[in-house]
């Protein structure tokens, strides 16, 4: 079983990387982007048999290490293969 985990800043948290990229795009003449946020996408291969077990592993991983609960939110998609 595989999963994709998406981690982004919470609403209202400053994203300096996103701000830098947004300004760089404007400086090279690309217009029309009002808000840009840079996040992380983590792909994992899970050694489990059920979707419930996969959810438990992902939730523990995100809450204990992968995402900072003070500044980030996460969501995920489980892909059965």
Stretches found by the model and what they are:
Residues 6, 36, 45, 77-79:
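Solvent-exposed beta-strand sheet faces enriched in polar/charged residues
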Residues 55-81:
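C-terminal structural segments of small proteins and small subunits
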Residues 1-11, 40-43:
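Short glycine-/aliphatic-rich beta-strand segments at the starts of folded cytosolic domains
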Residues 31-37:
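N-terminal glycine-rich anion-binding loops that anchor highly charged ligand groups
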Residues 12-16, 49-56:
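Short, conserved charged micro-motifs
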Residues 9-11, 48, 80:
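Non-catalytic surface loops within mature trypsin-like serine protease
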Residues 14, 25, 46, 65-66:
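Generic leucine side-chain signal with a strong bias for well-ordered alpha-helical environments
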Residues 12-30:
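Short amphipathic alpha-helix segments
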């Amino acid at each position: 079983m595989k999963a994709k985990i998406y981690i982004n800043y919470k609403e209202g948290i400053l994203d300096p990387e996103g701000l830098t990229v947004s300004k760089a795009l404007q400086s090279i003449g690309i217009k029309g982007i009002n808000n840009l946020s840079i996040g992380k996408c983590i792909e994992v291969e899970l050694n489990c048999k059920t979707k419930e077990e996969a959810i438990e592993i992902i939730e523990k991983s995100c809450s204990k290490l992968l995402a900072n609960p003070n500044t980030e939110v996460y969501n995920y998609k489980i892909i059965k293969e």
